[in-house]
Every structure is written in structure tokens, then in C-alpha cells.
Amino acid sequence: MKKRYAALIFCAIGLLLGSVTSEAKKKPSVTAESAIVMDVQSGAILYEKNIDKREYPASITKVMTALVAIENSSLSETVTYSRNAVTNLESGASNIEIQPGEKLSMEDSLYAILLMSANEACNGVAEHVAGSIDNFVAMMNQKAKELGCTGTHFANANGLWMSNHYTTAH
């Protein structure tokens, strides 16, 4: 029994004395074109790489579309898809083949956006919430400013490429 206690105490001491804290000797390897790590409380930048370089946000745009839609509608609302919403897409754009006049709940529309990357659902939700895609994009840009995303500018609700559609890590 004494041997067990001695072994337990020896292991505990070994664990306590064996612990060593250290800090990274080299910067992490980041393959992204731009990146930033900040301390949330102080705002101090701990790591940066091309933080003000404009990048194409692609489908990250859909996260902002969903956020603005959720804040300005109810999940139970019905979205009626216009011809413009479902046909105003570039060839090969991701879609779930919503038809003009088709009705989906806001909740189902958001699932289509976030899970299926449905570009026509982004357009339909934008029209439903703000009356037009352009009005909705203005709401997205306002929300970006409110969140401190000063290097971000949206030009559409779905993230398809446009030259004035960009974001930065900072």
C-alpha cells in the first residue's frame, strides 16, 4: 500500500515538474493569401499577413446574406421567387432549380443558401426582405460597417464574382 502511495506521489510530482511552458519560436505557416489573428479584448494584432489586400469573398457572402435576412424577417415568412431572382444568374452558378413563382419559407430558403449554396435563393430572399437585390446589398454593406468590416464591400447577395465585390482580412 505504501508503495502505491509513493508511486502516486512520484507521478504527481513528475507531472508538475515536467510541465514546461513556451512560446512559438517561429511564425505559423499560413497558406492563405491574407490572414489576421487579433486579441478580442485588446484589439491587438497578434499575427498578420496582407491584412488590407482585397480578396474575393465568394460564398462567404452567403453568410452575410443569411445574417441580414434573419435580422429583418421571420423564418415562417413565405418567399415568392420572381423570374429575375431565378434567371439572373451566370451560366454554371450553383442553384437548386427554383422556378419563377415558386414559394418557400424563409427557413427553407436559408437552408438552400447555407447548405446548397443556392444563388437564386439569395436573390429571392434579397428581393423579399428589401424589395430589390440592390436595396438588400445596401443593407449588407451597412451591416458590414456595423460589424467593423471596413474593408468589405458587397455588390450582390450571392457571392458571384464582380469587380467591386471584395473583403479584407482586417
Per-segment meaning from a language model:
Residues 2-24:
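Sec-dependent N-terminal signal peptides of Gram-positive bacterial secreted proteins and lipoproteins
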Residues 23-166:
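Active-site-adjacent loops and short helices of periplasmic peptidoglycan-processing enzymes
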